Amino acid sequence: MKSARTSRAWIKAHINDNFVRKANHEGYRSRAAYKLQEIAERDALFSPGMTVVDLGASPGSWSQVALESVGPTGKVFALDMLDMQSLPGATFIQGDFRENGVLAALEKVLDGKRADLVISDMSPNLTGIRVSDQAHGMYLAELALMFCREHLNPGENFLVKVFQGSDFEAFRQLMQADFAKVVIRKPKASRDRSKELYLLGLEKII
């Protein structure tokens, strides 16, 4: 009974969420679009003609923002283990980023070129066990960072979702070895009770 009450409370809060209503009105697939928009505007992440890789893309709101920002001369490559309704201008790969074959498929569509921006909103299947969820989230963030080491152009940027916890500082130090500057972002569209943060690596060193 408690879980049913919790579900009803979540649904009510979701329906009354200003960002949810705004996303529905403006045609974005989720409220997450405004997280990326806020960070992108603050830190000037996008420019026309960029090649963007969007990890954990489904349902596609970050890819929508990326497509709007890079324009017709840009490219957006989206990846998620969940299906995503097609977006004109975006190339979507469905699969688990942890599997070598899926990574190889992404490398194939990149066709030997590197990205100008990597954005990752990947999240594990949350269990409610904070320590476990945080550890799995950090593992996905580390995979995204490893991808950047090989496939992000020097001097370019990397935005990744992480969860506050015991491994947070260690992961930030990993990023600091690869980027000239690493900053923390908590956009307004990120719910107050959420432990999620975003780390932004600016100007990849190598």
From Swiss-Prot:
Q: What is its EC number?
A: 2.1.1.166
Alphabetized Gene3D superfamilies for the sequence: Vaccinia Virus protein VP39
Output a single Gene Ontology CC term carried by this record: cytoplasm
Task: Please give the positions of the paired cysteines in each disulfide bond.
Answer: none
* Active-site residue list: 161 (proton acceptor)
Q: Name one GO molecular function term.
A: rRNA (uridine-2'-O-)-methyltransferase activity
| Short name of any one Pfam family annotated for the protein | FtsJ
**Reaction equations catalysed:** uridine(2552) in 23S rRNA + S-adenosyl-L-methionine = 2'-O-methyluridine(2552) in 23S rRNA + S-adenosyl-L-homocysteine + H(+)
Domain of life assignment: Bacteria
Keyword list (alphabetical) reads: Cytoplasm, Methyltransferase, rRNA processing, S-adenosyl-L-methionine, Transferase
Compartments it resides in: Cytoplasm
The record's annotation in InterPro entries points to: RNA_methyltr_RlmE, RNA_MeTrfase_FtsJ_dom, rRNA-MeTfrase_E, SAM-dependent_MTases_sf
Q: What class of enzyme is it?
A: transferase
Q: Which residues bind S-adenosyl-L-methionine?
A: 60, 62, 80, 96, 121
**Where is the major localization of this protein?**
cytoplasm
Q: Which family does it belong to?
A: Belongs to the class I-like SAM-binding methyltransferase superfamily. RNA methyltransferase RlmE family.
Role noted for this protein: Specifically methylates the uridine in position 2552 of 23S rRNA at the 2'-O position of the ribose in the fully assembled 50S ribosomal subunit.
Q: What is this protein called?
A: Ribosomal RNA large subunit methyltransferase E
The organism named in the record is: Nitrosomonas eutropha (strain DSM 101675 / C91 / Nm57)
